[in-house]
């Protein structure tokens, strides 16, 4: 009986640890996807990169994780939702009125890369939820990938 309790306890601890690892991997996955997109852009050029980054079935759209691209004025250059491409979103606030795209531009201009927090409607839950986006500057582009905070 003691062995059974020990096995069950160990299984619970392993499961909890795995859940934490998966939750923590979201941020790592977002960073990795942006880094992969930057490398793709540098290897293939602007036109091919924007085409691939705008492809809803492309290698940079992994369901909840996808890369989108702004120029330095927060005009959308690439996004799996093609209806956003060409729109200047600099002055479009989040649910709390925060001009987070201005913060994205400032962050990459000053630091080269970084995380920006804001609130956004989650398409899965239809609720406004806290979100954070990793952004990195590559030449005049800003490549980003966001995750909902859990």
Please give the residue ranges for each predicted region:
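N-terminal membrane-sensor/transducer module of prokaryotic signaling receptors
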Residues: 2-150
């Amino acid at each position: 009986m003691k062995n059974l309790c020990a096995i069950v306890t160990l299984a619970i601890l392993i499961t909890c640890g795995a859940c934490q690892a998966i939750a923590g991997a979201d941020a790592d996955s977002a960073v990795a996807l942006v880094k992969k997109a930057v490398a793709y852009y540098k290897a293939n050029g602007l036109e091919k990169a924007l085409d691939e980054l705008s492809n809803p079935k492309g290698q940079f759209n992994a369901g909840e994780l996808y890369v989108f691209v702004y120029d330095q004025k927060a005009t959308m250059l690439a996004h799996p939702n093609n209806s956003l491409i060409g729109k200047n979103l600099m002055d479009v606030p989040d649910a709390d009125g925060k001009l987070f795209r201005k913060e994205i531009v400032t962050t990459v201009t000053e630091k080269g890369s970084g995380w920006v927090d804001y609130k956004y409607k989650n398409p899965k839950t239809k609720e406004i939820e806290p979100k954070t986006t990793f952004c990195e500057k590559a030449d005049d582009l800003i490549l980003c990938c966001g995750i909902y905070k859990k």
